[in-house]
Curated annotation (Swiss-Prot):
Record text on cofactor binding: Magnesium is required for nucleotidyltransferase activity.
Disulfide partners: none
Any Pfam family matching the protein: PolyA_pol_RNAbd
Similarity field: Belongs to the tRNA nucleotidyltransferase/poly(A) polymerase family. Bacterial CCA-adding enzyme type 1 subfamily.
Organism this protein belongs to: Escherichia coli (strain SE11)
Cofactor names: Mg(2+); Ni(2+)
PROSITE patterns: HD
Official protein name in the record: Multifunctional CCA protein
Other facts noted in the record for this chain: A single active site specifically recognizes both ATP and CTP and is responsible for their addition.
Residues annotated as binding Mg(2+): D21, D23
CDD domains per record: HDc, NT_ClassII-CCAase
HAMAP family reported for this sequence: CCA_bact_type1, CCA_bact_type2
Role of this protein: Catalyzes the addition and repair of the essential 3'-terminal CCA sequence in tRNAs without using a nucleic acid template. Adds these three nucleotides in the order of C, C, and A to the tRNA nucleotide-73, using CTP and ATP as substrates and producing inorganic pyrophosphate. tRNA 3'-terminal CCA addition is required both for tRNA processing and repair. Also involved in tRNA surveillance by mediating tandem CCA addition to generate a CCACCA at the 3' terminus of unstable tRNAs. While stable tRNAs receive only 3'-terminal CCA, unstable tRNAs are marked with CCACCA and rapidly degraded.
Domain HD as annotated: residue spans: 228-329
């Protein structure tokens, strides 16, 4: 029996990145031998065991053979005669097909070290094409390591295009697509994930609402980048700089979906695109089974982001009604989320990357003023039932009006 550290732990250590999870491969052993040594078996489809002390995963070396469609259609073979090289060959990318023995020596049968040095994401073997999930995984790795200068090897991108063209992605479940997307949204450069999907044709299959934005023009006066798809990825990039939250980043990604519905004869204007985009947000989220909280914020951002841009023009009643509409009294975090997504929208434009966004500050200030109006005083004044809410709203509007007169510049 020989034990090797494999995969991501080896890769990230060589890149000088923090190692989170460690996975091990056991060569020359059997399930019974592992159980006798005190390991606990957890894998049902193939033999994976938990170490009795560290609880890290130890898998018997195995090979995989395609036996059906999609990413689950594989038959595994695990036996003492399966070599380390056999096991590493089934992995997706060469930089993930690295192993380290107990002396610290790196075993690299597929030139993963060379690709690591050259910052290349390259598939190990043609078997890559048998698993459609790998298209999403490579896009996610491209996003995760973009800041280190990694790019996808030409032959790997070509294979990803072929897989997409042959309909392999249609076998992916919504849950797996969302899981990979959610993970990509946590990276430093989530926009790279969607750009890679577009480069291989997968965006059209998995995110048609986003793909439809490319080639749709916006007024050059407001959008020097012109193309709404490019603007969408620029805003996502900006959102990633402004917030680590997945819901903020996803909402930013979806903020302009309504522009894809504008008839070409009305281009480059997109009047009413915000509310129009709400149904597309709902459609996308229902298809991918996006969690409700994330979906709800995306709907609100699509509907109201343009309203925030015009904040100095809003009357106090409209501002308080906005807080009602986003349910800010129960979910106050939405004010900050809406401020961040709206700022990302403005700064996600060519030449505006460092622009100030005072509307975000005014929104936050108005919220502090509105929420500081005490409910207790209204009750103590003798108001009852529905009158309490009406009087509370009236006082909030008055407070915001007073603040706006002093702090918010009047529109020209």
């Amino acid at each position: 029996m020989k034990i090797y550290l494999v995969g991501g732990a080896v890769r990230d250590a060589l890149l000088g990145l923090p190692v989170k999870d460690r996975d091990w491969v056991v060569v020359g052993s059997t399930p019974q031998e592992m159980l006798d040594a005190g390991y606990q078996q957890v894998g049902r489809d193939f033999p994976v065991f938990l170490h009795p002390q560290t609880h890290e995963e130890y898998a018997l070396a195995r090979t995989e053979r395609k036996s059906g469609s999609g990413y689950t259609g594989f038959t595994c073979y695990a036996a003492p005669d399966v070599t380390l090289e056999d096991d590493l060959k089934r992995r997706d990318l060469t930089i993930n097909a690295l192993a380290q023995d107990d002396n610290g020596e790196i075993i690299d049968p597929y030139n993963g070290l060379g690709d690591l040095q050259n910052r290349l994401l390259r598939h190990v073997s043609p078997a890559f094409g048998e698993d459609p999930l790998r298209v999403l995984r490579v896009a996610r790795f491209a996003a995760r390591y973009a800041h280190l200068g990694f790019r996808i090897a030409d032959e790997t991108l070509t294979l990803m295009r072929e897989m997409t063209h042959e309909g392999e992605l249609e076998h992916l479940t919504p849950e797996r697509v969302w899981k990979e997307t959610e993970s990509a949204l946590t990276t430093r450069n989530p926009q790279v994930f969607f750009q890679v999907l577009r480069d291989c044709g997968a965006l059209r299959v998995l995110f048609p609402e986003i793909d439809a934005l490319f080639g749709v023009p916006a007024p050059a006066r407001w959008h020097p980048e012109i193309d709404t798809g490019i603007h969408t990825l620029m805003t996502l990039s900006m959102a990633a700089m402004l917030s680590p939250q997945v819901d903020v980043r996803f909402a930013t990604l979806c903020h302009d979906l309504g522009k894809g519905l504008t008839p070409p004869e009305l281009w480059p204007r997109h009047h009413g695109h915000g509310p129009a985009g709400v149904k597309l947000v709902e459609q996308l989220c229902q298809r991918l089974r996006v969690p409700n909280e994330i979906r709800d914020l995306a709907r609100l951002v699509a509907e109201f982001h343009d309203l925030i841009h015009t904040f100095p023009m809003l009357n106090p009643k409209t501002i308080v009604k906005l807080f009602d509409s986003i349910d800010a009294w129960r979910k106050p975090q939405r004010v900050e989320q809406l401020a961040l997504t709206s700022e990302a929208d403005v700064r996600g434009r060519t030449g505006f990357e460092s622009a100030d966004y005072p509307q975000g500050r005014w929104l936050r200030e108005a919220w502090e003023v509105a929420q500081s109006v005490p409910t207790k005083a209204v009750v103590e004044a003798g108001f009852k039932g529905v009158e309490i809410r009406e009087e509370l709203t009236r006082r909030r509007i008055a407070a915001v009006a007073s603040w706006k007169e002093q702090r918010c510049p009047k529109p020209d």
